[in-house]
Design a protein with these regions (language model features):
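An alpha-beta-alpha
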Residues: 41-102, 125
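Extracellular/periplasmic periplasmic-binding protein-like sensory domains
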Residues: 142-214, 274, 280-282
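Sec-exported extracytoplasmic/periplasmic mature domains
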Residues: 15-20, 57-66, 87-95, 116-123, ...
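Hydrophobic alpha-helical segments within soluble ligand-binding/sensing domains
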Residues: 44-67, 80-82, 108-112, 135-136, ...
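Ligand-binding clamshell of periplasmic/extracellular solute-binding protein-like
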Residues: 3-12, 27-34, 128-136, 154-162, ...
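Segments of small-molecule ligand-sensing domains
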Residues: 199-210, 221-279
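Beta-alpha junction/loop-to-helix N-cap segments that form part of ligand/metal-binding clefts
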Residues: 1-34, 103-109, 259
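Extracellular/periplasmic bilobed ligand-binding domains
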Residues: 17-21, 85-178
Length: 284
């Protein structure tokens, strides 16, 4: 059995080798193709398209804005996948895309041209389906461009922005994001995990990758118990038994209440947070 991999590219490669022979459970590979090689492959996190769709739904349902702009890295599958799904779901959720701006990994330091177009578009909210390093630069340059009144909304890649070196975290005040876990959540389960993680890792604060992995281990244990796995079973038999057992697992984990479909996808609701006073505060 394999807990992993972390990223989509490696997961697709490993999944091709593991198909039907080694049970594989990725905590955080978000590309759709990460778990499509075999029926023995499962995922804890949301797919890229699901993040885009659910973000559009959340923004629309909570009336956060009607005029929305997007700024994303078009050279990365993660960013592009989320963007495409978000744009596709915008209209049915009452959102008008007034600017859809892109950059690439070769031009991810100066966003002035894109931000000017976004500012001129009259956007009320800027959707940022990027990782936190790029988003930190974007927030700084948006502030410099006089765009503090434009709301900012990200996805799980935004998690970690408060820890970016030399980033003025006050610029993240009011930023909203969908992510499955926050180390500042006040529920007993999350706080116990955070304390144990910090104690074991020299006060390093766990992020959603750590929480997803924690949940994967407990979901795998639940499936192994249900399947009555024994050491003398072959890899193929273990894989088949685990795959069948996973369909009956219901996990109340750090990242939410989860169950799984026959195609290995996780069925759970995302959590929305707003950064307030340097901490994540869960939104309704």
């Amino acid at each position: 059995m394999l807990c992993g991999t972390v990223t989509s590219g490696s997961c697709i490669a490993v999944g091709a080798e593991a198909a039907e022979s080694t049970f594989m459970f990725t905590p955080s590979a978000t590309a759709v193709d990460s778990i499509t090689a075999g029926s023995n492959e499962f995922r804890m996190c949301f797919t890229d398209p699901a993040q885009g769709t659910k973000s559009a739904q959340y923004i629309g349902e909570h009336s956060l804005a009607t005029k929305v702009a997007v700024l994303y890295d078009s050279s990365a599958d993660y960013n592009s996948g989320i963007n495409d799904a978000f744009v596709a779901a915008a209209e049915e959720n009452g959102l008008e895309i007034v600017a859809d701006e892109a950059y690439t990994a070769d031009s991810n330091t100066d966003f002035s041209v894109q931000l000017k177009k976004i500012k001129d578009s009259g956007a009320e909210l800027l959707f940022l389906p990027n990782y936190y390093a790029d988003n930190a630069l974007i927030l700084q340059q948006a502030h410099d461009a006089g765009m503090d009144d434009v709301k900012k909304f990200g996805v799980d890649g935004m998690d970690g922005i408060l820890g970016v070196e030399n980033f003025n975290t006050s610029l993240a005040e009011g930023v909203m994001l969908l992510t499955p876990f926050s180390a500042t959540s006040e529920d007993e389960k999350s706080q116990a995990f955070v304390k144990a993680y910090e104690d074991a890792n020299k006060d390093e604060v766990p992020n959603q990758f750590a929480a997803d992995t924690y949940d994967v281990i407990y979901a795998m244990k639940a499936a192994a118990d249900a399947a009555e796995i024994t050491p003398d079973m072959s890899n193929e038999d273990i894989s088949a038994a685990m795959s069948e057992a996973m369909l009956s697992v219901e996990l109340d984990g750090l990242t939410g209440k989860a169950k799984w479909t026959e195609d290995g996808e996780c069925d759970k609701e995302p959590k929305a947070f707003e950064i307030q006073d340097g901490a994540y505060v869960e939104m309704e």
